[in-house]
Amino acid sequence: MATANAMFERMANTWLALYLPDSRPSLILAHSARRLMDRFNQSIWSVTLSGTEEPDEAQPDSQGCAAWFADSNKKALLAEVGVGTLDQAMMAVMPFKHNNLRLLGLSNKILLADEIHACDAWMSRILEGLIERQASNGNATILLSATLSQQQRDKLVAAFSRGVRRSVQAPLLGHDDYPWLTQVTQTELISQRVDTRKEVERSVDIGWLHSEEACLERIGEAVEKGNCIAWIRNSVDDAIRIYRQLQLSKVVATENLLLFHSRFAFHDRQRIESQTLNLFGKQSGAQRAGKVIIATQVIEQSLDIDCDEMISDLAPVDLLIQRAGRLQRHIRDRNGLVKKSGQDERETPVLRILAPEWDDAPRENWLSSAMRNSAYVYPDHGRMWLTQRILREQGTIRMPQSARLLIESVYGEDVNMPVGFAKTEQLQKGKFYCDRAFARQMLLNFAPGYCAEISDSLPEKMSTRLAEESVTLWLAKIVDGVVTPYASGEHAWEMSVLRVRQSWWDKHKGEFERLDGEPLRKWCAQQHQDKDFATVIVVTDFAVCGYSANEGLIGMMGE
C-alpha cells in the first residue's frame, strides 16, 4: 500500500497530461486503506453529481475522482486511471463477489504491474491467469521488474500466449542479456536488449560481517564520521532487539535513532515514514548526519531513501539488489548535500551483509544455527547459500551489467545445490508446485461462459495471497471510563489499527490488556464489528501495555 500511495502522489501531478484538456477522467487509488490518504480524499468530487456525472467546473477538486468510483473497492477499477495494489486486479479472475465489475473495469485498459519478481508461487500463478484473461480480451499488459528470472519470464510469456491462442517460446538469455525487453503480440514475439543510460549505471561493493557485535561497531564508526546508516533486518524481533541495544550502548543519541517495522499502528507508521523521508530521503541535507535507522523489509521498495552506509541481514539476491538500491541512491557532496550533476563525493558504496561464516559444504542447519529468525523468514536456505556464494565470487553488484548473472546464479534451473540442502530443496519444490496447483484451482474457468460451473470455490474463502492468516488489532485508551481511539484526528479508529500474524498473536496475546465484557460489546456495536472476532488492546503505560509509539507492538519482549 505504501508503494501504491507513493505512486499515486506522482501520478496525481501528471495524469491529466494523458487526456485532452476538456476531458474529465477520474484517478482512483485502489486499495483497502485509501480512506486514510488525505490527498486522495481531497481529490474526490465533493459536489452532488447527477445525470452525466459532470462536476462543477468551479469546484477546485473536480479534477480528481468522482465520488461514485470512490465509495466502493468493487467499482474502483471502473475509473479511467487507477493506481493501487495488484490484488485489486487479481480479484477479477478469482471467484470474489462482483468480480465481473473488476473485469469490466480492466476492459480496454492497459494493465501495468511493477516489481512482479516479488510475487510468490501462488501470486505468480494468479498473475498468469490475469495476464491470460487480459490477452484474450484484447487488452495490453506491461510487466516491469529489475530482478526477474528467466524461468519467471517464460511463464508470463506462456500465459499471454495462451490468451492470444498462439504458441510462442521466448529465446534463452545469456548472463549479459540485461536490460531486456520481451514483447508478445498476436502475430509476433520480439526479444531484444534495451539500451541504458550511463548515469543510471551503479556499482556497489560487497562486504561481509559475521556477528551482530561487528555490525554495531560499524554503526558506531559511521556515526562518528557523521554518516547516516541503515541496518535492514529480516525479522521484527531482531530489529527491536538491536534498536534497544543501541539505545543502551549510548553509541547513538536517542534522538538520532529510528526504528521502522510492520508492527506499528497506521498512525505511528505514517509518522515514522515521514521522519524516514525527512532524514534519509532525496531532499535531506544536514539533518541526515549521524542518523541511524533500524528497519525491516518495509523500506526495501516503498520509500525513496538514500543512505550513506548500509548493513543488511543475508537475504535472497533479488532482495539484496533492492536494498542496495537504497545505498547512495542520489548524487551528493561529501557533506551529504544533494548535487544536480557530477560525481558523488562520498566514499565508495559498500553493502555490508551479516551472514554465517562461509562454508563450501554446508549442513542443513547452516543458516538456522547462526541466524535463527532469518532462517524462519526465508526458509529456502539453499537459495540463501547460493546468494552468498555468487556475491562472494563477484564482490560487487554492478547494475545493470551483472543483474542477469546474479539472478540466474540463484534462481536458474541449472544451479547446483549442496547435498546438505537436499531435504530443504525437496520441501521447497513441493511447496512451490503445491501452491501453484492450489492457485490454479482458485482461478475462474471462463471457458463455459457466465455460469455456475466457472468455479467450485466460495467467495468468502478467497484471498489473493497465500500467507498465514493475520489478526486485526485496535489500540484504545480509556479516558474517564470512555473507550477512545489511540490515534487522534480524522479516521481515528482506522489509524489505530495494526495487523499481526495469527501465530504471533496466539503466542503473545496473554501479554496484553484487552477490552472485554460489556465495554467490548458496546464498542463493537458502535464500530459495527463482530464481538467474537474483534480484539481491542488497551494502551496505558508502555512498560505494562506492550505498545509504544517508538517501538510498536512487542508485548513483554525481553522481560
Label the model's feature ranges.
Residues 1-4, 142-144, 228-234:
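Conserved RecA-like ASCE P-loop NTPase motor core of nucleic-acid helicases/translocases
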Residues 1-16, 27-38, 148-152:
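Conserved Walker A/P-loop ATP-binding site and its immediately adjacent core
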Residues 20-95:
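Inter-Walker segment of RecA-like/P-loop motor cores
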Residues 75-79, 95-111, 286-290:
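Short basic/glycine-enriched coil/helix segment immediately N-terminal to the Walker B
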Residues 104-110, 117-192:
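Post-DEXD/H (motif II) to motif III coupling segment of the RecA-like Helicase ATP-binding lobe
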Residues 153, 213, 217-220, 224-283, ...:
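C-terminal helicase lobe and adjacent C-terminal extensions/tails of nucleic-acid helicase motors
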Residues 165-239:
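Conserved interdomain linker/interface between the two RecA-like ATPase lobes of SF2 helicase motors
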Residues 285-288, 293-310, 325:
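SF2 helicase motor core recognition
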